[in-house]
């Protein structure tokens, strides 16, 4: 079953130098249980692609296409629904994991922390 899908995703930044395409026509899918790694040179759009998933891009970024999470279009979601998804179904660990993750705590505990803060569940289920 497809968990995450990009359909013709495009991100263009607009600034003093005009329009700059950062992501051009990405089509890919990730099924439940699969792992996806995105690699490339500095400035090729990896972070832009990841930030687009949770709509964390700056206001001057124009995003078109579709990003489907469990069949639901993240780009069409209202802010309330998006906020709920950010805490329960999707999250991001930014580049430089040494600054994002605590080296003296298990990763599972760190990933589970926001779930425990926002959901009624046990630590075992959250991890």
What does each of the following model-derived ranges do?
Residues 1-127:
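ABC transporter nucleotide-binding domains
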């Amino acid at each position: 079953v497809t968990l995450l899908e990009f359909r013709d995703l495009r991100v263009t930044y607009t600034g003093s130098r005009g329009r700059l395409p950062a992501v051009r026509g990405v089509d890919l899918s990730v099924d439940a249980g699969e792992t996806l790694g995105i690699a490339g040179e500095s400035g090729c759009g990896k972070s832009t692609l990841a930030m687009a998933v949770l709509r964390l891009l700056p206001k001057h970024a124009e995003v078109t296409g579709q990003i489907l999470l469990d069949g639901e279009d993240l780009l069409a979601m209202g802010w309330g629904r998006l906020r709920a998804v950010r805490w329960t179904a999707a999250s991001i660990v930014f580049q430089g994991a040494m600054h994002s993750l605590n080296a003296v705590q298990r990763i599972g505990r760190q990933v589970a922390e926001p779930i425990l803060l926002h959901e009624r569940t046990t630590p075992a289920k959250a991890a």
